[in-house]
């Protein structure tokens, strides 16, 4: 700032040398250095997604209602008509955009942490898959970056495979947010949607499901490797009904992105969270990251800890239209074993101690 003021003073005095000298010194100003600019772009890219995740749907709904009360009401009416006519599109595979998935903003998003995608086995385009993503974390940051964008090159690492990241169906009832999500290939985590993708959308599809859901997000915290899986068997039944192979996916570092106040079972805080989850579909978490300006103060920006998502070995699943409980239990046990093996194989390679264990609840 002193350099800029000095340059301006030089201009007022009529000395061009001061201006030229100031321009020459601009790269030496800390907040104008290339690395600083890039870092701030990374923070902005992450913050825009966090704010989109938290408030875009509600904000756009409020704006739409406001526009209805102005002279521009026709614009809101036309969009609402389009939204009604297009209501079922998210449930039929959505409307992905390669252009949006390849935005430069997602590469800045990736590099902030950074986020990496590790491929362990090839996937056949002639098969369909269900990816079980663990852990959920607060916002599934690794899942979004790896499977909702092309920032880590998922389509190049798994050629012929089209990933469909599944999220709460309620998000697709929100104006503008629904278009934003669909452009990334994101779909509702609804039975009708998954059935459509796995049976009427050809082959080479991979539905990515955060199996632990809201219950798992309530228990996530730095240093903990806990997944909610013991009673989560619906995704296995769906895989059997469609003959879709199961693929365990573990994201090391997902739980390090935010710090959360975890309420104990039986506490008033946990009671409120469970009631909210029951009636609304998701659980409110009391969490914080760092601020835009400093990693030492609280804010909504996640902590810049590495997130490495490892895609495990696919489990071949036969097509059984009416699987028995025994069938479901068998393939669920195989899935749990495969996930445990994946965690144990990569934990020391990705910074965890050999003594750290995966807790399955």
Swiss-Prot record:
Any one GO BP annotation for this protein: glycerol metabolic process
Major localisation: endoplasmic reticulum
Known function: Essential acyltransferase that catalyzes the terminal and only committed step in triacylglycerol synthesis by using diacylglycerol and fatty acyl CoA as substrates. Required for synthesis and storage of intracellular triglycerides. Probably plays a central role in cytosolic lipid accumulation.
Annotated TM spans: 43-61, 66-85
Name listed for the protein in its UniProt record: Diacylglycerol O-acyltransferase 2
Family, as annotated: Belongs to the diacylglycerol acyltransferase family.
Pathway involvement of the protein, from the record: Glycerolipid metabolism; triacylglycerol biosynthesis
Keywords associated with the record: Acyltransferase, Cytoplasm, Endoplasmic reticulum, Glycerol metabolism, Lipid biosynthesis, Lipid droplet, Lipid metabolism, Membrane, Transferase, Transmembrane, Transmembrane helix
Entries under Pfam families matching the protein: DAGAT
Residue intervals on the Lumenal side: 62-65
Disulfide bonds listed in the record: none
Keyword DNA-binding appears in the UniProt entry: no
Organism whose genome encodes this protein: Xenopus tropicalis
Catalytic activity: an acyl-CoA + a 1,2-diacyl-sn-glycerol = a triacyl-sn-glycerol + CoA; all-trans-retinol + an acyl-CoA = an all-trans-retinyl ester + CoA; 2-(9Z-octadecenoyl)-glycerol + (9Z)-octadecenoyl-CoA = 1,2-di-(9Z-octadecenoyl)-sn-glycerol + CoA; 1,2-di-(9Z-octadecenoyl)-sn-glycerol + (9Z)-octadecenoyl-CoA = 1,2,3-tri-(9Z-octadecenoyl)-glycerol + CoA
């Amino acid at each position: 700032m002193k350099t800029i003021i000095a340059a301006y003073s030089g201009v007022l005095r009529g000395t061009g040398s001061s201006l030229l000298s100031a321009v020459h010194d601009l790269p030496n100003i800390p907040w104008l250095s290339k690395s600083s600019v890039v870092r701030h772009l990374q923070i902005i890219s992450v913050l825009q997604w966090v704010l989109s995740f938290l408030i875009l749907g509600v904000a756009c709904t409020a704006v739409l209602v406001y526009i209805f009360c102005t002279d521009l009401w026709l614009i809101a009416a036309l969009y609402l008509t389009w939204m009604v006519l297009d209501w079922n599109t998210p449930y039929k595979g959505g409307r992905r955009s390669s252009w949006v998935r390849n935005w430069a903003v997602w590469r800045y998003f990736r590099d902030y942490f950074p986020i990496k995608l590790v491929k362990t086995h090839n996937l056949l385009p002639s098969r369909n898959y269900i990816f079980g993503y663990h852990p959920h974390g607060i916002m599934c940051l690794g899942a979004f970056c790896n499977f909702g964008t092309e920032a880590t090159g998922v389509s190049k690492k798994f050629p012929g495979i089209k990933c469909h990241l599944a999220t709460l169906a309620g998000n697709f009832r929100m104006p503008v947010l629904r278009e934003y999500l669909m452009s990334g290939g994101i779909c509702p985590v609804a039975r009708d949607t998954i059935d459509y993708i796995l049976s009427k959308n050809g082959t080479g599809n991979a539905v990515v499901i955060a199996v632990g859901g809201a219950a798992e997000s309530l228990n996530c915290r730095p240093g903990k490797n806990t997944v909610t899986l013991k009673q989560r068997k619906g995704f296995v039944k769906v895989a059997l009904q469609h003959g879709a192979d199961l693929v365990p996916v573990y994201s090391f570092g997902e739980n390090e992105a935010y710090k959360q106040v975890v309420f104990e079972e039986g506490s008033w805080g946990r009671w409120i969270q469970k009631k909210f989850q029951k009636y609304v579909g998701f659980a409110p978490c009391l969490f914080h990251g760092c601020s835009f300006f400093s990693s030492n103060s609280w804010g909504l920006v996640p902590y810049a800890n590495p997130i490495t998502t490892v895609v495990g070995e696919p489990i071949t699943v036969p097509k059984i239209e009416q699987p028995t409980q025994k069938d479901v239990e068998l393939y669920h046990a195989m899935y749990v074993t495969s996930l445990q093996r994946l965690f144990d194989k990569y934990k020391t390679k990705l910074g965890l101690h050999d003594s750290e264990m995966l807790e399955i609840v």
